[in-house]
Each structure stands twice: as structure tokens, then as C-alpha cells.
């Protein structure tokens, strides 16, 4: 009986204060691609703090050929940012949970400083070994950017840090 109690207590504690590195890639409206690399610190009840670096590319059709060519894809509009997000858990189930994502960032495009406010929903599915798969619906408000609003879907993976 005592062994079962100790095993249960250590299992519960293992989910608290866990850390993960995550990589997510997504498509944003209109003609945008997004990549985020982050460090996530999970606190009690699947609430979490996320420290992230984000890159964004917006492509356009080439003026000379009317198609998307390498120059119109890679050199049209690019931005990056570094930020923090708080993610309170709003739904829990067996091997999955959902979090709101509320954050802020600062960064740059090729010309000016950008500020951002980030809002969204993230749903996580827990796999063996502490790995997680997630999808995220994100809405970003970018201050002084080419796009004022960015919205889209991101898919990613989270790897445990021991």
C-alpha cells in the first residue's frame, strides 16, 4: 500500500514543473508562413509559461512573371520576434488538454521595430515519453508591421527537457 502511494505521488509530481522545447510551423492568412521555436515551463494543472522566438514570411506574386518565384517568396516581407506567453489551461481530458495563449513580443522586419500581442488556443496531445503533439489557432496583432492582423493554424511537436 505504501509503495502504491509513493508511486502515485511521484507520478503526479512528475507532471508539475516540467519543461519542453517545441517547434511549430503554420500557415497564416493572407499568404504567410510562420515558424516558432519555444521553451515551455508547465506549472500546476497544465498552466504554462512559454518563451518563444518566431519567424514570419509573407510571399507575393512576382511582378515580371505573375507566379510565385524564389525572390517573391523569400524576399517579399520577413519579420522575427522574441516574446513571452502565459497559457492557462481551459480544458483537460485523458492524454490531452487545451490552453488559451496570451502573450506579447518584440522584434523587427527588415526596416523597423515591431511589437506584437498574441492571442489564441492551443490543444496538446500527450504521447509516450513526455512528447506532445499540438495544434494551435493563433491571432496576432502586429504594431508597425505590414500586416496589422495575422491569423492562422500551427502544427507542432514538444520534446521534454530533463
Tell me what each language-model feature is.
Residues 10-12, 91:
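Intrinsically disordered and other compositionally biased segments
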Residues 12-58, 152, 158-162:
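Short glycine/proline- and aromatic-enriched beta-strand/turn motifs that initiate or cap beta-hairpins
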Residues 23-36, 76-78, 105-117, 141-150:
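Solvent-exposed loop/turn segments connecting transmembrane beta-strands
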Residues 135-137:
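Internal, hydrophobic beta-strand segments that form the core of beta-sheet-rich folds
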Amino acid at each position: 500500500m505504501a509503495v502504491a502511494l509513493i508511486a502515485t505521488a511521484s507520478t503526479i509530481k512528475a507532471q508539475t514543473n516540467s519543461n519542453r522545447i517545441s517547434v511549430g510551423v503554420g500557415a497564416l492568412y493572407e499568404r504567410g508562413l510562420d515558424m516558432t521555436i519555444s521553451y515551455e515551463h508547465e506549472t500546476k494543472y497544465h498552466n504554462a509559461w512559454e518563451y518563444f522566438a518566431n519567424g514570419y514570411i509573407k510571399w507575393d506574386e512576382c511582378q515580371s512573371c505573375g507566379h510565385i518565384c524564389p525572390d517573391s517568396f523569400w524576399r517579399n516581407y520577413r519579420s522575427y520576434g522574441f516574446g513571452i506567453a502565459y497559457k492557462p489551461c481551459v480544458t483537460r481530458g485523458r492524454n490531452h488538454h487545451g490552453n488559451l495563449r496570451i502573450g506579447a513580443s518584440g522584434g523587427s522586419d527588415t526596416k523597423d521595430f515591431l511589437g506584437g500581442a498574441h492571442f489564441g488556443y492551443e490543444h496538446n496531445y500527450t504521447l509516450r515519453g513526455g512528447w506532445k503533439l499540438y495544434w494551435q489557432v493563433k491571432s496576432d496583432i502586429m504594431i508597425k508591421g505590414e500586416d496589422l492582423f495575422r491569423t492562422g493554424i500551427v502544427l507542432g511537436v514538444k520534446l521534454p527537457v530533463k
